[in-house]
Amino acid sequence: MKNTALHKAQLQRMSEITIEHYDRVADDYWYGTRNHDVSQNYEAFLEAIEGKPPFDILDLGCGPGRDLQYFNSMGHAVMGLDGSEALVFIARLNSGCEVLQQNFLAMDLPEHRFDGVFANASLFHVPSQELPRILLEVYTTLKSRGVLFCSNPRGNNEEGLEGSRYSCFFDLDTWRDYVIDAGFIEVHHYFRPTGLPRDRQPWLATVWRKG
């Protein structure tokens, strides 16, 4: 996959292709991921948020709502956002939470609204040329010293259309540069699944605080 700049129409089309993929596989995606153990990610995210719960949380790229269900069950005020109409429908049904249907490239987020933004396996679909703008929008929607959690598949800074999804695979240093440039301070990072050799840990999880 090549890292080449996309013009506006190409960006829109890559986004549409990715969303159409999730619309097609929405039910299978729910049944295939609903029992995944991401408790390590929940703990890393919630432990970094300052103050006393319950917290105001945005699940960015919430998919079919597994994580919405968890945060809601813990008493937090959680809102979801996803670009796929089919996934949004399932997420609302599963969680009972408010879920916004918004394309990542055209979000409309309130300012200074959330204690934390949980972006589990979602931001890697944002083309790198748009990532600074998207991260700034996330920064703006967080309250002072709010927390951003991200988990993305890692790689050697390749990006492009992978099958029917646009994907970016950053290494740690490159991902750090993007998020730090948006104004965030790194809290910590880790690789998943835990307990395996690094070459068998394809996921990079990072926790950030609004600077």
What is the predicted role of each segment?
Residues 145-152:
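Conserved beta-strand signature within the Rossmann-like core of class I S-adenosyl-L-methionine
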Residues 195-211:
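Core SAM-dependent methyltransferase catalytic element
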Residues 158-174:
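Acceptor-substrate binding/catalytic loop of class I
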Residues 2-52:
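Conserved class I S-adenosyl-L-methionine
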